[in-house]
C-alpha cells in the first residue's frame, strides 16, 4: 500500500498549480500525481504532414493528455477575467478569483514567461465600435505566452516539481473509493453517503497495478476526462447537472484583416446575438499569425488553433473559432454526445476535418481543391474540401453566417469569398459537479477542480482553482 497526504488525478493546469502551491505552503507534503498521458518530453503527435497526415487515434493522445493537459500545446493564452472562462467566481467570489488568476500569471512569469505582453481591453475604443454594430466586446486582460513559451514554462515547472512530487505517468486511474473511520463499522454505506461527513478518513485510488491511499484527493481530469468523471460521480453518488456544448467552425483569413484588433487586444472575445433565434455566437481562441491544427477528443477529430510568440514560426494568417453555445433542458442530458455526433458526421464525410470557402458556403456549393488553391488564403491545415452545411445543423450554420457578416462591419474583409472555414470545432464541457465554496464535493477532502469540474473552461481559471484548493487543504491541515 502506498500512502500520501494528497493524491492529485490529472497533470493539467489545475493539477500542476495545485501541486505547486501545496509544495510552496508545505515542502514536506507528500504528493502523488497520476496522469493517463505521457510526461512532457514524450508528448509527440505522430502527424507530420508527410507520412502521417491525419489522426491515427493513438491510445493516449499526446495533444490532449500528458503533463500540461490539453493546454500544453495551446497558444498559451491566460485570460484574467470573470466575464468568460468559467464560473469560479460563483464559488469563491469575484475579487478572490481575479487575485488567484493574477497570482498564476506571476508564477508563469517566474518560470519562463517573462517578457511576454499583457494585453487589456481597458479604455479601448473598439468597444464602442462593436456596440455600434450589434456586437459586444467582453472585458479581459490577456497574457499571451504563445505555444513555444507556454511549453518552456511547463518544462520549467516540471523541473521544479519532479523531485518534490511523485508523478505516475501513463497511469490511468480506474476508480476512486471513499474510506471511512473505523468507528463507522456497521453503518450502511447509503447512510454514510447522505451527508458531507467528518467520518471520511481518506481515499483509495486504484490503478491497473496497485492501490494508493491519501487523506485528501484532488480530481483535475480536464475535458478529455469527462466520461471518466461522469462515471466517478455516478459511482460515488455525487450530484451533477447538465452543462452545455459549443459547436461551430474555425475561421482563417489574412492577418491584416484583424490586425487593428489583434495588435491592440491580441484576443478579442466578441459576442453577437442572432436575429431569428437570438442565439449567442462568439469568437473564441483567436490566434494572430497562427496555424490551424487537428484535435482528438475520445477518438473524434475536431479542429483548433495555435499561435507562436517567436516570429520565425508565425504565418500570414489569423484564425479564430466562431461557436454557438447549446444548452439543453430535460429530458435530454447528453450535451457532449450531441456535439460528438456532429463531429463524427464531419469525420465520416471528410475523413477528418472539412474546409470550405465562405463564398462557396453562402452559394450552396462544396469547395474543391482548385478553388481553395486559387484563393487568397493559403490553408495552414491539410483538410478535406467539402460542404459544412451537410454537417452543421441549419440553426448553428445560419448563426455563424450572420456573425461573419456582423464581424465584416468592424473588420472589413471577414466575409470575403476566400475566407476559410474549418469544421467542426466543438468545445466539450463536463457535467457541472455540485461543489461547496471550497470546491469540495459532498465528501470531506474530495476536491474537484479545473475543466473536469464543469466550473472552469480556461487555462487561467483551471490553474487558479488548483491554487485555491491547495490553500484550502493546507489551511485545514
Question: Predicted regions span which residues?
Answer:
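Dinucleotide-binding Rossmann-like beta1-alpha1 core, especially the glycine-rich loop
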Residues: 66-116
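Residues forming the flavin
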Residues: 2-81, 122-124, 128-477
